[in-house]
């Protein structure tokens, strides 16, 4: 996993700035699928019906959701401003077309909505998590409707997506949850620990 992360950082720094949009999207999809494979996550999604310039609207369970969406339909993301300052991950988000939103600032929200609408009008997909936070995946919180406004401004379609994680036996998996007091490190430990348990039970990844 560390090797793939390093490869992703190098690719983002050395290849992305010189790549065409289609090539960047292919790289994002490949890298996201590779990350999911390493973590033993099989993607079951069909967003092929999404026309260019669609807004993907999804619930939010985990930091893995970004890889899930990008593996299915490479998109720009709308994220809270704080993410920009995270070590490594913030830098990666910044060069991966992430649009950062300052919470609580109506003036900034209007500017961001115009920016998102412009991206959609260019035929690029934009993904948003309108709950504004994560849950354990067993329920959906109130949506912040203002995040959907750019699709209306640009006259672009909205593609709803329900994200959930499941065990091989069909039970809902809580290992990827990134809510409450769970840190990024704890979440990753939970996922890796669950992989080891499943391997011990005879599952192959």
Locate predicted features.
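Generic beta-sheet signal
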Residues: 53-58, 80, 98, 101, 124-129, 161-164
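A cross-family acyltransferase "interaction/gating" segment
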Residues: 88-90, 138-205
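Soluble, non-transmembrane catalytic domains of enzymes that act on hydrophobic metabolites at membranes
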Residues: 42-46, 66, 78, 84, ...
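A transmembrane-helix-recognition feature enriched in membrane-embedded lipid enzymes
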Residues: 1-44, 91-96
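Soluble extracytoplasmic domains of inner/organellar membrane proteins
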Residues: 109, 116-148, 152
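Membrane-embedded segments
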Residues: 63-120, 124
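Conserved H-X4-D acyltransferase segment
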Residues: 28-81, 93, 136
